[in-house]
């Protein structure tokens, strides 16, 4: 057994303090962990996040950046890139096809949230049949800018300093894997 060398917390050096603080709008990255996308798969989750708000708000823009690798021809890509409300199992943005290796995508579909509400969202893509084993996609939610989120309680824009964290939330690489079967 491992025995403790500290029997009581009687000095500052024996304790740590952790302060967590949210903003008027708080973002949380939920995943997924790095994984695989099957060829011809539909609605594969490539980014999952939660938004929580103190006030009634309207989100005017969601900005994403998608990076894909190992594309060998122009027919490869990730079609049907869109955002869902996870709890409602409903698509909340228009869908776009990602056909280049680096793509910025801003969704301008308006999302309203009530004060005290926390909502989980996910970004999905389809696995294009032309993709090769080893092709991958990595999605990031870009930082909000002034005017992206409006506080409906006082009819002003939420200051970017009140969005926590207001930096890029990077997702994990999702790699194309062709299905295989082994018979013995």
Per-segment meaning from a language model:
Residues 1-184:
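Exposed, polar/acidic Ser/Thr-rich sequence context and nearby capping/turn residues
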